[in-house]
Amino acid sequence: LKLKYGYSLIHISSDCVFSGLNAPYSDTDQPDALDHYGATKAISETLLEADAMVLRTSTVGHEQNTKHGLLEWFLSQSGRVNGYKNAYFNGVTTLTLAKLIYQLICSNVGFRIGIFNVASERISKYDFLCIVQKLYRSDNNIVPDEKVDIDRSLIQSKHINENYCHSDWMTQLIQMKEEFND
């Protein structure tokens, strides 16, 4: 795109390119996904990394028509919900990612070719759901569950650190909730 049309591509990838067995992962670690989704995301990274800016992360956000993501899934539930105490991630909200991409586009030095991890504070799915429960005033009963053991935490890329200041999960979720309700 850059050579032919003068445009640059920012591709969003996933922490699911990793198995979750050897965290934390740097942007130079080789993907080792054990499932089809993660493996195909890893292939897309390989195909694009020489010509695009690949932002590897995990996102949480509101959805328009589905309830597949963790946030919307939880908010659509009623009653008892399992919260995985040993399932860790450190992604960002979709609003935080959008702000970062805007900064990268508007910055003279923000856009670079390669793979870059975008991360925030490491959190378990259980603790994340507890924050969501409090913020959204959910009546769901979150039951601690230790059956799942996975950690897809990423080490934030130095270049991303220079262009983005991340907030804690509560702050990110408050900002996203306010933006979504406007």
Regions found by a protein language model. Give the residues of each.
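Conserved Rossmann-fold NAD(P)-dependent oxidoreductase catalytic core, especially the SDR/UDP-sugar
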Residues: L1-D32
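Active-site Tyr-X1-5-Lys
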Residues: S8, P31-S58
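Short acidic donor-binding/metal-coordinating loop in glycosyltransferase active sites
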Residues: S14, T57, S120
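Short-chain dehydrogenase/reductase
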Residues: S26-A42, G91-V92, R122-I123
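NAD(P)-dependent short-chain dehydrogenase/reductase
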Residues: T46-F89, L95-T96, Y102
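Short, amphipathic alpha-helical "lid/cap" segments that border enzyme active or binding sites
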Residues: L71, L75, T94-Y102, H166-N181
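Mid/C-terminal beta-alpha module of Rossmann-like enzyme folds, strongest
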Residues: A98-L100, S107-D151
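C-terminal amphipathic/interface module of NAD(P)-dependent oxidoreductases
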Residues: S138-D182
